[in-house]
């Protein structure tokens, strides 16, 4: 019987967390974007590596500045996750290093006595100045006692070494929690996040960050999955943007969402989308709980 381990991937937005998940799972399972707040809830994906079953948890890129209820729930996800994982992977973008942020995460990990490995991504951006990598390596080694991996998900440089390294870390101790920690509504939440990921890519300004998706109903049949979902926005003008001229944008969102979901689930999808204005929804406890942003 394979040992089951739980690994959480954390880091600021746009460090490559979702890209790493998709690479390890060898398929598209998590929305990727250069924009902030691509991931708002923990997303779970299992994969077999080196004879072990590893459950990767893609966590939100938390904004430490925002104080709305949504941001608070995202921050709380960090703390709750730390209580049930075997290893924390802290991802850093080599082109955007702010160790003050990392310090706050490492402090939480230290309190929870969680093993940590630091992944420095996008080293291809520093290929012309290798001395920069050595300086960074020395700087981190002087301040932190943890495993350190330099890699590039774009060029795949250092990725194999990183995977082998984290597996060796896990092999040194038995799993902390061999039980299934994946929420029962994870499938629905992941569908919602895929649709929201499409909206993020197709819209601009404040629209991507003021949008939430909630699947009201879903019916799974033999060959097709039917879902009816609401898209929530803060303002009337945002609703107009989501719908688009003569419904062009909402149609495009539906088509691209359907294609991504069919690729992931291997079934046909029928998607019905409705756009609703819900002012200040980020502080609406009931709605956030219905969507799955709050347990």
Language model region names:
Residues 114-117, 124-187:
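Canonical P-loop GTPase G-domain recognition
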Residues 187-295:
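P-loop NTP-binding site
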Residues 30-33, 174-178, 201-212:
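Active-site phosphate-binding and catalytic loops of NTP-dependent enzymes
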Residues 1-82, 87, 231-232:
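Conserved G1/Walker A P-loop phosphate-binding module
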Residues 47-54, 73-147, 219-224:
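Conserved C-terminal guanine-recognition region of P-loop GTPase G domains, centered on the G4
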Residues 39, 63-64, 97-98, 126-127, ...:
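Catalytic P-loop NTPase motifs of RecA-like helicase/translocase cores
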Residues 59, 92, 151-154:
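Cofactor-binding loops of NAD(P)H-dependent oxidoreductases
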Residues 16, 158, 249:
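Conserved glycine(s) of the Walker
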């Amino acid at each position: 019987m394979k040992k089951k381990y739980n690994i959480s991937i954390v880091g600021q937005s746009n460090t490559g967390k979702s890209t790493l998940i998709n690479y390890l799972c060898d398929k598209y399972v998590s929305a990727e974007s250069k924009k902030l707040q691509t991931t708002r809830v923990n997303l779970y994906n299992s994969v077999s590596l080196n004879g072990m079953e590893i459950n990767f948890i893609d966590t939100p890129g938390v904004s430490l500045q925002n104080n709305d209820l949504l941001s608070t729930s995202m921050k709380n996800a960090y703390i709750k996750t730390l209580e049930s994982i075997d290893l924390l992977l802290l991802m850093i973008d080599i082109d955007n290093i702010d160790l003050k942020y990392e310090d706050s995460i490492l402090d939480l990990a230290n309190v929870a006595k969680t093993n940590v490995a630091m992944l420095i991504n996008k080293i291809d951006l520093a290929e012309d100045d290798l001395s920069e990598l050595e300086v960074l390596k020395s700087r981190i080694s002087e301040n932190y006692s943890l495993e350190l991996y330099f890699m590039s998900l774009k060029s795949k440089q250092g990725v194999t070494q990183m995977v082998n390294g984290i597996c060796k870390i896990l092999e040194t101790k038995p799993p902390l929690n061999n039980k299934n920690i994946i929420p029962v509504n994870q499938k629905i939440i992941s569908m919602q996040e895929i649709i929201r990921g499409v909206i993020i890519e197709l819209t601009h300004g404040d629209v991507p960050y003021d949008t939430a998706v909630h699947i009201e109903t879903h019916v799974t049949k033999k060959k097709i999955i039917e879902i009816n979902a609401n898209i929530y926005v803060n303002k009337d003008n945002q609703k107009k943007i989501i719908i688009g001229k003569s419904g062009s944008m909402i149609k495009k969102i539906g088509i691209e969402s359907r294609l991504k979901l069919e690729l992931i689930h291997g079934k046909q999808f029928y998607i019905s989308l409705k756009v609703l204005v819900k002012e200040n929804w980020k502080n609406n406890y009931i709605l956030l709980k219905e969507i799955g942003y709050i347990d």
